[in-house]
Structures are given as C-alpha cells and as structure tokens.
Amino acid sequence: NRDKHITIFGSSKQGKTCLRKHCLNENDYILVQCSNRWSLSDLNANILKRAGYELTESTNVTYEGKAKVSASVKILDATLGGEAGGGATKNVTHRQLELDLSDVNDIIGALNEARFHQYIVLEDFHYLKSEVQKDFAIELKAFHESSELCFIIVGVWLDENKLVIYNGDLTGRIVPVNADLWNEDELREVIQKGEDFLNIRFKESFTSEAIKASSGNVYIVQETCHRACNESGIHKTVVGERRLVGDGLNARSLVAEIIQEQSGRYNAFITNYASGFQETALAMHKWLLYPILTSSIEELSKGLTYRSIRSKITSGHPQGKNLNPGNITQALKAVSSLQLSKSIQPIILDYDESNLTLHIVDKGFLIWLSMQDRNELLSTVGLPEMT
C-alpha cells in the first residue's frame, strides 16, 4: 500500500525483518540500518546514499550556519531509434544538486530528481535518539503529502501509535503491522515447516514443552529445535525414512540453556539501568526497576500500567506518597533513551505513551527473570527486598 507509510513493530527476535524480506523482493526497496549516533541530517544523508547519490561537503552554508552538501547522481535515460538498427539506447546523465540535509523539501526534491520509486526501509528505527525519531515523524508527513515515496519503518516497540504520538498529523497516514504475536498454532506451523524441510518429526511432548517454555518467542522456539537437532546429530535433510527427534531430550532445559547464555547481558542491564544518566537524589531510574523486579511474570507479560507502577514505587520509595508523579512520568518517557545511552542493545524496556504502559520487549528477559532470586536482584541495585 504505497498510499501510506508502514510500521512493523514487535519485541526483539520476533520475525520483523523476516516478514519484511518475505513480502518484498530485494529490488523493491533500499535498506537503511539506523544508528544511535545519527542526527536527522545523518539519517537523510544515508537515505540519499542508498538511493544512489554521492555526497560531498559544499562551501555554502544553510541559514543555520551548517555546511550544505553537493549531491550527484547518475541517471539512465532510455531513448529510441539509435543510428544503427533503431533499437533502444541508454544515455547517462548526471544531476548535480546542492542540498540542506536538514530540509525535507531538499530530500524529496533530490529523490524525485533521481527518479527514485523504491520503498525506503528504515531498520532498527528504535536505535535512533528520541529527538531524531520525533523530527523524522514530522518529515514523514511531508513525504506523504509532497511525494509518492513510501517508508517501511521497523523497530522494537509495542505501541502501534508510536509515530502518531510524535506527530498527530500522521493519523490515518500509517499502516501499523504488529509482528509480536505468535499463537501456539503459528509456532507449531514454524516447527512443522522445519520438520518437513529436514525430513524429521519432533516428539509431541518435546514440541509442546518447547512452545510452552518459550513465552511466545519464535526465536527461542527455533533455537530450541536447532539445538535438539544438533544433539541428535542432524545437520542436514535426513535421507530416507522420516526420523523422530526429541526422545530423551528436555525442551525446558534447552530453553534454560539458551536463556542462561544471556544472563550476563541481563544482569548488566539491571545494574547499568539503575545508575541512570547520572546520580540524583530521587534515583528514579533505579526505582523504575522496583515494580519490574517485584511484579509477577504474568503481570509483566501484559505490561505494567502507569497506575500500578506509581503504586509500587510510592510503596517503597523513601518519599512515599509525597513523590511527585511528574518524576515517574519523566523517567518512563526516558526509558528508551537511557538504554541507548548505556548501549543496551537490543533494548529490554519500552514505554507505550498511548496506553501509559511499560512493556518488556525482550521475551528472553521474562524467562530469565522467572529463574532468578528476585530479592538478590533487588539487593544488587540497592532496592528494598520483597517481604
């Protein structure tokens, strides 16, 4: 649907990129892999580069005093009736432009000049700084109204209205695609496709346990099956009779093994997140971990509402009910930027400003948390233990 931009969102390792690759041919799009170090101008520059432009710094400056860039692109012009034989010939013409990379009108003009018509995929959009995401949401409206260009934005979050919050003018101009939800039948279908490809069959009890232990994470299901195949000596398609796999293997133990390999990353997340951007009297980022580390896995799976977060924090924080709710809101809105500043990748938390809900967007973290001594984790970051 080129009439609207598209967002593909969901938790980490839930198949967002696979979905995009499945639906688009390589020639249908250009891919821009986002970086947490980019400004809006950097993002726009990378879009132009992937579209075929060569960029060099100009001697002229923008009205803000920043250097403009010279952009050049080669364009193939097909003409009919060559001198010999009357067949089609191709002439290469060069376009030379001077651009302000922070001006969306210049970017649209450059892409139109290059006769660019592919989809533009922005992968890992959540890695961009919050202010860059917000600024680009403003640009998206201009792309929608002043061009036929279509963006496909892929990121780790669970709020289908994330970009609309950044720019209300995008209402009705974005198609959100939720790639987070995998039900049991869909996970079974994933396993079955692998079984058919390898000419094997997993034992039913193994399949059921793998799905149950995965918390709905398709990567964990696939990795569990992969390790079961390795332990059974299956590294390629079985020739002849279909082979049974999983007999004598414990799917839950394999899942625990996969999660345990991430233990260092999850422990580092807790300690690094607790330290916040800097030391403050209220230590709000540390206290934001309190409702996470004291809630049940079921509660965390559904997401923690602002009301429940506030209730849990005020029940344990030294200032109690005198704590200003604005401090909690401010900490919640900084969830993503704090993780990026601490190089926590992939991110583990995301705050849904539409529904005022804090989500765990790394399902592996939920499984890991279910295996931990919560009081030990609380003690590690100086929070009161559960009674």
Report the location of each language-model feature:
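Residues immediately C-terminal
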Residues: 127-130, 142, 159
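Short regulatory helix/loop adjacent to the ATP-binding pocket of P-loop NTPases
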Residues: 159-174
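C-terminal leucine-rich, beta-strand-based interaction scaffolds used for sensing/assembly
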Residues: 246-387
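An amphipathic alpha-helix signature
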Residues: 41-48, 184-188, 192, 207, ...
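Amphipathic alpha-helical "lid/sensor" segments that cap RecA-like P-loop NTPase cores
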Residues: 203-261
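P-loop NTPase nucleotide-binding core
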Residues: 2-121, 127-134, 148-149, 323
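Substrate-engagement module of ASCE P-loop NTPases
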Residues: 139-150, 331-338
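Conserved small helical "lid"/interfacial subdomain of P-loop NTPases
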Residues: 179-207, 215, 219-224
